[in-house]
A protein has these predicted regions:
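C-terminal edge beta-strand
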Residues: 2-9
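Beta-propeller fold detector
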Residues: 13-34, 77-87, 138-151
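Beta-propeller domains
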Residues: 21-23, 55-84
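Beta-strand-rich domains and repeat architectures in extracellular enzymes and scaffolds
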Residues: 30-63
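Repeated scaffold domains used in trafficking and secretory/extracellular systems
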Residues: 40-46, 87-102, 147-168
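Entry beta-strands of beta-propeller and related beta-repeat scaffolds
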Residues: 52-56, 105-109, 171-177
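Short glycine/acidic-enriched loop and turn motifs that connect beta-strands
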Residues: 60-64, 113-123, 181
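Beta-propeller blade signature
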Residues: 67-72, 122-136
């Protein structure tokens, strides 16, 4: 996919050294339960609708994510999507902070993590993007993109990146916007 981190430049970022996607199949735990049973004790961070499915991202008190595909008519859980590949390094971050849909229906999400100015600090934790695809009744999740750079951090020396995301376009050709503060 084409990802442009610097608006208006039209140049593709250097992705050498980025993490290759690791595919993990889901394990079903909340399937056929009501939404209320599945999110009891959790805080909803985002709920979106697309592809005839409602997607709910909720986190528990330890910020561990639960990502559900829900039937919008019956309000029952169709699937719990895998999140065990989602990672975060900073204690104030989230393994999975937000989700969005591409115009061609691919579910994507991001971590919220501290990204530092590499030239100043010498190294940085990456900001991660994830994707989920559906093959029949099986959901497959993977790390899609991982990046640690000054541009990713909004040119701050030390920034929390990924509280929210917005995506415009298809999965293979789109624009990602995120927060850095």
């Amino acid at each position: 996919p084409e990802i442009f981190l610097t608006p208006g430049t039209g140049t593709e970022p250097d992705v050498s050294g980025d993490i290759v996607a690791e595919y993990i199949e889901m394990k079903q735990t909340y399937v056929n339960q009501s939404i209320g049973d599945a999110i009891t004790g959790k805080t909803i961070r985002r709920a979106i609708y697309g592809n005839g499915v409602m997607y709910i991202l909720a986190v528990d008190a330890s910020k561990n994510p639960t990502l559900l595909a829900v039937d919008p008519t019956t309000h029952t859980v169709i699937a719990e999507l895998p999140t065990n590949f989602c990672v975060v390094n900073s204690p104030e971050g989230y393994k999975l902070s937000d989700i969005a849909l591409t115009s061609d229906g691919v579910l994507i999400g991001c971590s919220m993590d501290t990204v530092r100015n590499v030239s100043y600090y010498g190294s940085s934790d990456p900001w991660n993007l994830y994707k989920w695809t559906r093959d029949g009744n099986t959901w497959i999740g993977s790390k899609w993109f991982s990046r640690a750079s000054n541009e990713t951090a909004g040119n701050y020396y030390d920034a929390m990146v990924g509280s929210t995301i917005a995506y415009s376009g298809s999965f293979n050709s789109g624009t990602i916007l995120t927060t850095a503060y």
